[in-house]
Design a protein with these regions (language model features):
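Catalytic domains of lipid- and phosphate-ester/thioester hydrolases
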Residues: 2-956
Length: 956
């Protein structure tokens, strides 16, 4: 008898169960694990039920939501949560990014809204970056039953920690030196991993050179067989992938159609690189070695049999791959015959190019006594042979002409691109490893100064580059932008050359200290007078150590000695570096040894510690001044004891390395944390308690630190690969690697984080990996309104305190575009009264009121956006205007200033309080508190609270 679970299976489920056994072994190694997440809509449904229950509005919820939650086997209506959100008439409040500036401004807004009776009407409290600071303070106060946002002790704690990163300023302050020591410790560990890895790569050419010059003549036949075997495997893999990925499903009937499924199942270009390009590069390196040794042996020319073998190899692999994939090849005999002819011609071209390489090698071999001949062969041989395959691809496309489909041409074109990448990478590696130290001889007297100056210059350039033209409004061809683009390249090149030079000096020190005789010239080797001088770099005027012929000769002799007689030393160094790299990569957590924990601990001490300090419960360590009980799990806020709004902490999911063409400008998406669930549209969501370490799930401190991780190598649309390299190497890293909701939460941290560190280094974080890179929410949307639009809030109060001295309002503009594209929602708002400023830089209004068109055909579903902008209209209190008179940039002082004194703190707080009161405080006596309603909003829209310089009200 079948079990109940078996009887309820759908036909699709039965089909999946039948094939699951066959795919089990394949999935383990090649296929992604089945998604463990749920859609965002299901997470929102849980939030709405909690809001309805807390506010007493649960009877208004759409019954379809209740039914769906009661019967898990019934699929809920896809729009049921939207109907529920509309009926609940949700109120959302948002705090924008902007560091401590935004936090203090939004504190004033909070206090004003509470005084007006509006705060208790808020259902969602959404924050980004600096707005998250004060969001966490408010949540901690509500959790600890602090009755008012005006609580003197809680607010006083914030004032005393206005310099939250280093409360005690000064050169000899322990706080200041702690910043330096934490950064230095973490950077040294991180750099040890990266430098050892780079050194490993730079040692590889020396092993290749040893194989190139010590190839036993007795094994030449075996080497030729191995070479053609590797090339045959590589070509066959390319063609199998080509046919399988471009043939129709009904055509894939050959014997390899099923057995090569793992080959196709790899995501992206993984199959091509693992099974085709890596063997091809290895085969070409071996081929170059054979050509060099044949040239050294004195053979006049390559045997003619190689021409036949090259053509036969190409034809055989083509035919075998074609037949193995498409069983109906008999009906395509004409096309197959034409392809065979093309394959033969391509094989002949490859032989001709190989013969050209052989002739060049013969010339170099005559003067290799010792000299750069063998090293030139290593530098040019394999890259040129790999590039020759690209030329064969070009010839093949041209000969097939109209007979080749566009899809096939595109496939071959992309293959040629990868061949170019691999060819250039191998060439650059050999050039840096071998020729880099040689060129440093000419720079010997000022290389140290250049390195120090270059490091300082590129560090400054990295900070400049963080101010992207997308938001700064500056000319992208300005000097700063050009410097930011060039300096990271210069530093990266300098770093690689310095590591290469260090390796060279370390390996050749023994040669120069001992009387090692120079290698004797080989019999029949010509030694023209200028053979060594031809390899030297150009003379640099003004240097005290000119590169002489004798210096170049010594260099090549030492290099040849270390790569031949002392190859064991090279091997032991390689092993030692590998051990160091592996151990550190295993033990050094890429999250815990970034600057994020330092940042998080100080945010927690300032903003979350305030509530416990107000209650007299905070007991900090007398030495460090930290109390790690200040922080608590975000998931705790869904418990019955908490009666505040549902917090949404917004971060940016970096998708720089993703393949979605629609995200090429954004290069990030929204990733949110709430007490109920966390995730994104791309990854789905999981219960928040399953994120982070420990039973309580991810903490609020970690969430707000991630939401405020502005300085990160991957920064959404701000990301630049060269700046990412610079910031990662110098450990300017505040972002967080967290497990994707797609995968089970059995492990939150990557045991081997080195792979993800490389993604950070090259700026290629994506959304398909097990671990995702989250950074500042402002790298996607800086107002925090995006997720409230997704939840269809009826009333949204948006506080914008981002740095915007020119009133560009890029945050609002980006929000409008994203909502129109992603949700098909239009936001209609006129901000001209805020933008228009007089000679004193005073705006005509502090805020603007707009409509949110959730449904263009149903105006009853419209929402309303109240946009509060940090601005001055001239009606502010005297202390605010006095601070403005002394600080012209107020209220848009740089976000880099995270050290607020009392005057600065109080000025921003009072400004936020003033703007919120002027926007919402009604003129009619006896009508307070304000109740958000359509009637009240329409009253404003019809001029009931028109803007005026005296009142500083809303523009409508």
């Amino acid at each position: 008898m079948s079990s109940p679970s078996e009887t309820t299976k759908t036909p699709a489920a039965l089909d999946r169960s039948k094939s699951s056994g066959a795919r089990k072994g394949v999935r383990k190694y090649f296929l992604p694990a089945p998604s463990a997440s749920k859609p965002v809509s299901q997470g929102i449904e849980e939030e709405l039920r909690a809001i309805g229950n807390r506010s007493g509005r649960s009877d208004q919820q759409d019954t379809r939501v209740k039914d769906a939650s009661a019967d898990q086997t019934t699929k809920p209506h896809p729009d049921s949560w939207m109907h529920s959100a509309t009926r609940l008439r949700l109120v959302g409040l948002t705090f924008s990014g902007g560091g401590i500036r935004s936090a203090t401004f939004c504190l004033g807004v909070l206090q004003a809204l509470e005084g007006l009776g509006l705060l208790r009407q808020v259902d969602y409290l959404s924050s980004v970056s600096g707005g998250g600071y004060i969001n966490s303070w408010f949540l901690a106060c509500r959790r600890n039953k602090i009755a008012s946002t005006e609580d003197q002790a809680a607010v006083g704690h914030l004032r005393s920690f206005g310099r939250y990163l280093a409360p005690a300023a000064g050169f000899f302050s322990a706080d200041t030196w702690t910043i330096a020591m934490v950064w230095l410790r973490n950077s040294m560990l991180l750099q040890a991993i990266l430098v050892s890895f780079i050194a490993l790569l730079l040692l590889l050419p020396r092993f290749f050179q040893w194989a190139l010059t010590n190839f036993p003549a007795s094994h030449l036949m075996l080497a030729w067989i191995s070479t053609f075997g590797l090339l045959a495997f590589s070509f066959a893999a390319m063609l199998v992938l080509l046919f399988k990925q471009n043939a129709g499903e009904e055509q894939r009937t050959g014997i390899l159609s099923q057995t090569t499924k793992p080959l196709i199942s790899l995501k992206g270009q993984g199959a091509l690189q693992i099974f085709a390009l890596v063997p091809l590069l290895a085969g070409m390196a071996l081929f170059a070695s054979l050509l060099w040794n044949t040239a050294k042996s004195g053979v006049a020319t390559l045997p003619a049999e190689l021409l036949f073998e090259s053509a036969l190899l190409t034809v055989a692999t083509f035919v075998a791959a074609y037949i193995s994939i498409m069983r109906d090849y008999k009906r395509r005999i004409g096309a197959l015959a034409g392809s065979i002819l093309v394959g033969a011609v391509c094989g002949a071209l490859f032989f001709a190019l190989g013969l050209l390489v052989f002739r060049v090698f013969q010339g170099w071999a005559r003067y290799d006594c010792p000299g750069p001949g063998s090293w030139k062969a290593g530098l040019w041989g394999a890259p040129f042979l790999v590039s020759s395959v690209s030329l064969c691809v070009v010839l093949q496309i041209g000969l097939l002409g109209r007979a080749m489909d566009d899809s096939i041409r595109e496939w071959w074109s992309r293959l040629a691109a990868f061949l170019g990448i691999y060819s250039f990478a191998s060439f650059a590696l050999e050039l840096l490893a071998i020729w880099g130290p040689l060129y440093t001889f000419s720079l010997a007297n000022w290389i140290v100064g250049a390195a120090a100056g270059g490091g300082l210059l590129t560090t400054i350039a990295g900070l400049v580059a963080a101010c992207s033209p997308h938001t700064s409004g500056t000319d992208r061809f300005s000097f700063k932008e050009i410097l930011a683009a060039i300096a990271p390249f210069a530093f990266s090149l300098l770093l690689l050359v310095m590591i290469s030079t260090g390796i060279h000096y370390g390996l050749t020190a023994h040669y120069f200290q001992s009387s090692v005789p120079a290698p004797a010239p080989q019999a029949g080797c010509d030694l023209p007078p200028n053979n060594l001088a031809s390899a030297r770099p150009p003379q640099i005027e003004g240097t005290r150590s000119p590169v002489t012929q004798e210096m170049v000769k010594d260099y090549w002799q030492a290099l040849s000695h270390s790569s031949q007689q002392d190859i064991r030393i090279v091997l032991w160094l390689f092993i030692a570096l590998a051990v160091v790299c592996l151990i550190l990569a295993w033990r050094v957590d890429i999250n815990e040894f970034s600057m994020s924990p330092f940042y998080r601990n100080r945010l927690v001490r300032c903003f979350l510690g305030a509530a416990r300090a107000a209650r007299g419960e905070r007991k900090p360590n007398p030495f460090t001044k930290f109390d790690f009980k200040d922080d608590f799990g975000l998931a705790e806020l869904k418990q019955p004891g908490y009666d505040g709004p549902v917090p949404i902490i917004n971060t940016a999911l970096n998708m720089v390395g993703g393949g979605d063409a629609g995200l090429q400008e954004r290069r990030a998406s929204s990733f949110f944390f709430t007490p109920y669930c966390s995730g994104s549209e791309q990854t789905g969501v999981r219960p928040t308690i399953e994120f982070g370490k420990g039973k309580g799930g991810i903490t609020i401190g970690r969430c707000i630190a991630t939401s405020g991780a502005a300085a990160s190598p991957n920064m959404g649309y701000h990301t630049k690969s060269t700046v990412a390299f610079l910031m990662t190497f110098f450990n300017v890293r505040l972002g967080l690697w967290t497990r994707s909701p797609k995968f089970p939460a059995s492990q939150q941290g990557a045991r081997w984080g080195f792979w993800y560190l490389l993604k950070e280094l090259f700026g290629t974080a994506g959304d398909d990996d097990k671990f995702l890179y989250l950074s500042d929410g402002g790298h996607f949307e800086n107002l925090g309104v995006y997720e409230l639009i997704r939840r269809r809030c009826r009333y949204i109060i948006a506080c914008d305190a981002e740095q915007d001295e020119h009133f560009v309002m890029s945050g609002l503009g980006g929000l409008i575009r994203k909502c129109r594209v992603d949700f098909d929602v239009d936001i209609e708002i006129d901000t001209r009264e805020i933008r228009t400023r007089d000679a004193n830089s005073y705006s005509r209004a502090h805020c603007a009121l707009g409509r949110v068109r959730y449904d263009r055909n149903d105006r009853d579903q419209d929402g309303y956006l109240v946009y509060l902008k940090a601005s001055l209209t001239g009606d502010e209190d005297g202390d605010i205007l006095q601070y403005k008179a002394e600080n012209a940039a107020f209220p848009h002082q740089s976000t880099a200033d995270q050290f607020f004194d009392e005057s600065q703190f109080e000025s921003y707080r009072r400004l936020g309080q003033h703007i919120a009161k002027s926007a919402f405080e009604t003129r009619e006596p006896g009508t307070s508190p304000v109740i958000l309603s359509d009637e009240w909003i329409e009253h404003l829209l019809q001029g009931g609270h028109s803007p005026s310089p005296q009142m500083g009200g809303c523009q409508v």
